[in-house]
Regions:
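Nucleotide-activated donor-binding/catalytic signature segment of Leloir-type glycosyltransferases, i.e.
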Residues: 349-354, 505-525
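N-terminal subdomain of nucleotide-sugar transferases
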Residues: 129-162, 167, 220-336
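Conserved catalytic-core segment of nucleotide-activated headgroup transferases in glycan assembly
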Residues: 290-300, 436-511
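Hydrophobic, well-ordered beta-alpha structural blocks that scaffold small-molecule cofactor pockets
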Residues: 1-130
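A charged, aromatic-enriched C-terminal amphipathic alpha-helix characteristic of glycosyltransferases
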Residues: 582, 596-636
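Acidic donor-binding loop of glycosyltransferase active sites
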Residues: 377-381, 533-546, 558
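Short alpha-helical donor nucleotide-sugar binding micro-motif in glycosyltransferases
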Residues: 374, 525, 530-535
Length: 640
């Protein structure tokens, strides 16, 4: 094998008309791409680990940490050039390629990649010891500043990863070297933890959680943020062993609240509770607008109101300080975002529900204020709407019956997953405190945004397929696009609407112009039910989430095309018998089948309406929720 061919040798090897895949379009990958394009040497498809959105090349699109089978699906190549510096990525992609018939001498490695942070140039090596030395040197040159560029942090994250996996003895050396720069240490530890989480390796995650739990008390702000980021990243995985992490995450929360609320330690008396009062904890972790949090807390509150309960929503922003830098989801103050969030969604909440926003910038102040205000409300029950995503419940579950949502996730992703509910079997305390999950009842509003196809330049009699999601840039991959393209080539009056964060240059790469003209991309806002009423089929990508999007579509009588392997994702509401075996070819084949048979299409639409109606009775859900609260209280009082 050409172990270290280098850029020049690679260019000499690649002759005209060769098909080349470049993994990692940064640094040397960009240089390779440019030279190949300038010399018109072959067809290039370039992938970037994270920063492809910063590139303007036609053949580059963003594929953040996708599995190799997703990256290479539908592609053909003669050479693969691994420009990435990540040892793990090289190892995994090489393994995949060789298992699928690529000869070893057709897999080329960059000998080294340099990084320039504007002040100094650093070189990265596969040797962990050299990498550690480079990290330390870089840190010294930057004089301990922890506001590093995102690229540089990712650079270090990769090498912490390789050190921990391949030669763990180096991790202690690095932590010792960083002892005077603890914020930088925590920041990189976070990056490492998230990378491990994405790699779905439970043993490594537990090891990292052990390091995190050892961080000193003065780093409580970072501990607090780590808890949220860990839970958020868990929500994007469907194979994580949640039961192996749940206890550690609770331990992290308890450490945070014990530091911030030290005067509460050792309390044993139970606070006074007023019958019929329910406090609902709502940590704000999403953007203002329609989201799982909006739909869930409003439905919980409304259904309990109809059961005669006195409900109060406690809105708890998860991070309000700009000092968190890129680790927070916004540079704006979260109190302001919270006000926007509530204002945007107040009409969905029953007028009998009271709302209080906890507006404190200091974490200790925020947690203590939240606990004080909830205690003053004297609730009979507490509902943690995000299942321990709010650290307040890590204190209050000792003093109140706390009902948890049946998932460890922070977003819609996985909220309806049976697999997650099953994972709680290890803990009888939590399994007995799960909120029953309905299909939410959404009031049908008059069409106001897209009430006729002329608004979108689509002929009225067209067959319309729709795909919706907040993360479509990573969910709609080349395999789905190419499969849909084949169907649309045959069906000239078929249109495809994509609602979400699609980037045409990256996600819809290489599509014929005629097909491209029949694709519409919309922002994720506006009257989605009105849009759905104009659609024939909801096409669900191979993903874990999509639950609320599918729910809205079903209510409007849209046929659902989803894969059976996504049964534990948003598609669980459809029913196993309605899902498709196989992959994208079979999925898009089902869309074509619905196109070819108007009778089957109408029958399927009507069945979706019926399923939706059967599962959307808010009164039945409210009754079930009250029963769950009573069972939770009984368990709490018995000390289970």
């Amino acid at each position: 094998m050409l172990e270290k061919p280098g850029r020049r040798r690679f260019l000499e090897e690649c002759v005209k008309n060769k098909r080349i895949v470049i993994y990692g379009a940064l640094d040397s990958g960009q240089k390779i791409y440019k030279e190949l394009q300038d010399r018109e040497w072959g067809e290039v498809v370039a992938f970037a680990d994270r920063d492809a959105e910063n590139l303007s090349m036609d053949h580059v699109f963003h594929c953040p940490l996708l599995k190799p089978e997703k990256l290479f699906e539908g592609l053909e190549w003669d050479y693969v050039y691994l420009a990435t510096s990540s040892p793990n990525a090289r190892k995994e992609i090489k393994r995949y390629l060789m298992e699928h018939g690529t000869q070893e001498d057709r897999i080329l490695l960059a000998d080294e990649v340099s990084f320039f942070d504007g002040k100094n140039e650093y070189r990265m090596y596969d040797d962990p010891e050299k990498a550690v030395c480079q990290i330390i040197q870089a840190n010294d040159n930057l004089k301990g500043e922890y506001e590093l560029t995102l690229q540089f942090e990712e650079w270090m994250e990769e090498y912490y990863y390789s050190v921990l996996i391949d030669q763990p003895e180096y991790i202690e050396r690095v932590r010792t070297e960083f002892s005077s720069h603890s914020l930088l240490d925590v920041r990189i530890m976070l990056g490492l933890y998230l990378f491990k989480l994405k790699a779905l390796e439970a043993d490594g995650m537990k090891k990292l959680m052990g390091y995190i739990l050892q961080l000193p008390d003065e780093q409580v702000e970072w501990l607090y943020l780590l808890g949220y980021k860990i839970a958020y990243m868990e929500s994007h995985q469907n194979k994580i062993l949640y039961k192996d992490l749940g206890a550690d995450r609770r331990a992290l929360w308890e450490k945070v609240v014990n530091i911030c609320c030290s005067d509460r330690k050792g309390r044993t008396e139970l606070p006074e509770r007023k019958k019929g009062r329910v406090a609902v904890l709502v940590p704000i972790v999403s953007h203002p607008g329609i989201s799982s949090g909006t739909m869930l807390y409003s439905t919980v509150a409304n259904s309990l109101c109809k059961q005669g309960k006195q409900v109060k929503l406690f809105i708890i922003p998860y991070a309000q300080r700009k000092s968190f830098g890129f680790l927070s989801t916004s540079d704006t103050m979260f109190c302001e975002r919270t006000r926007q969030y509530i204002q945007a969604n107040r009409e969905t909440i029953d007028s009998g529900v009271s709302i209080e926003v906890i507006e404190k910038e200091d974490i200790s102040d925020m947690l203590n204020t939240a606990i004080d205000r909830i205690t003053e409300f004297q609730p009979q029950y507490i509902i943690d709407i995000m299942d321990e995503l709010c650290p307040v419940s890590a204190v209050l579950y000792k003093y109140y019956p706390v009902l948890y949502r049946p998932t460890t996730c922070s977003t819609t992703t996985g909220f309806f997953q049976k697999a997650m509910m099953q994972s709680f079997e290890y803990n009888s305390e939590i399994i007995s405190r799960q909120i029953p999950v309905p299909i939410l009842h959404i009031k049908k509003e008059p069409a106001c945004s897209y009430n006729k196809w002329n608004d979108l330049g689509i002929p009225e009699e067209s067959f319309v397929v729709v795909t919706v999601g907040e993360r479509l840039s990573s969910e709609v991959d080349i395999g789905l696009v190419k499969s849909m393209e084949k169907v649309m080539q045959k069906k000239k009056d078929m249109y495809w609407i994509l609602v979400g964060d699609i980037d045409v240059k990256k996600n819809l790469i290489g599509i014929e112009d005629e097909i491209h003209n029949r694709i519409r991309v919309l922002i994720y806002e506006g009257d989605l039910p009105a849009l759905y009423r104009l659609c024939d089929v909801f096409l669900n990508p191979d993903r874990v989430g999509g639950g609320f999007s599918i729910m809205f579509a079903m209510q409007q009588g849209v046929a659902i095309a989803a894969l059976k392997k996504n049964l534990y994702g948003g598609a669980v509401r459809v029913g196993e018998e309605e899902l498709i075996d196989g992959g994208y070819e079979e999925l898009c084949g089902y869309v074509e089948k619905l196109y070819d048979s108007p009778e089957l299409l109408e029958e399927t639409k009507e069945r979706m309406r019926k399923i939706s109606q059967e599962k959307s009775d808010i009164k039945l859900w409210g009754s079930a929720l009250c029963t769950a609260l009573e069972e939770t209280e009984r368990s709490f009082m018995e000390g289970d």
